[in-house]
């Protein structure tokens, strides 16, 4: 069964889902990510970065966020479903990208990365760091320093506002054999 939803304005694919039986897996997660990036690029979604994925029943769902000048823009999200038996794209969901994509001002950084680190838990072992735009609960966006780190055996994402130095959000990263998600 193939289900497709097309936007009235612009005729963009908002949602597509195709169901079929999945055979034995022969495509790796890494190869599926490459296939996904090529698919997105060929359909006009440029500068997309894999952020999270989940494997279920022979299909991997990969979240891709737009990247502008090295800043990960999480509101501009596209989700792809890729079959792990043959690499076929079986689904796409573009609502986040279609509703939010625009050029952002990513130069309004008033707090240095080092200043932002001062607000972190001293027990946090930093694994990676960079800039990201995240959505807020008030339907706006904020430019933040994103720190991926670990305390004991738990991984976290900590977001520090790049303009005010205020902690905006903390997410727990859940690593499972089937993928990486946050909550």
What are these regions (language model features)?
Residues 1-183:
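Long, terminal "pre-/pro-" and other extracytoplasmic accessory regions
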